[in-house]
Amino acid sequence: RMSRGLGDVYKRQIYFIFRKEVVQMDALVEGLMEELNCETVFTIPLFGGIPVYESVVVTWIIMAVVFLLCILLSRNLSVENPSRRQVVVETAIKGLNDFFTETVGEKGKAYIPYLSAIAIYIGIANLIGLLGFKPPTKDMNVTATLALMSIVLIEVAGIRARGTKGWLKSFAEPMPIILPINILEVFIKPLSLCMRLFGNVLGSFVIMELLKMVVPAVLPAVFSCYFDIFDGLIQAYVFVFLTGLFIKEATE
């Protein structure tokens, strides 16, 4: 009887532990679905109603902030007596220009403004979660659009540098036998850019939730700081760096 009673106690303990784990996993799945779900903020009453999602509104906010900063930072510029603000801005712009020049090469300099704009947007989009907004990069539509824009620009850069015939001929280089692989690569590049950015941003949420389950205090706050700041900036760097390398490959 005593051994049977101990067995029942162990069974109940295992049952409660298992039930607790199931509840926690259900909460994780529910939180993940909330992160994937993009809410409709309002609807434009045209063509039967055009929904405007949260990621679009946050993108508009980012665009407005960047636009206002550009106006404020470009006021009262002077060649002879530059202010500290002007020196800081010029140093930052020169740094971006030098970095992207090394990445895309001399032939790809015309695409540096695009790469700079994308880097600034993705960086701010990944950091905007610190202000309570949902980062637009958690919406796969946003990351897919960024990837498609970049790939279209890469192919256009290749056509401009080599001409239409040279661009078509490049698919059969270095050997005609790898033509299918080169064609497939055109579709693989945007997919890899999209999934890398989306997966890393979403993966940070999953890791944070798992850490909260295991160590509910202190440690999650430290990792939250890392994922919200450093990982977001790293993903912006990786996206534009790969895009720059693809442009260099297409133009040389």
Which positions does each model-derived feature cover?
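Selective transmembrane helix interface/packing segments
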Residues: 14-252
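Single conserved hydrophobic/aromatic residue that forms the stacking wall/gate
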Residues: 1-13
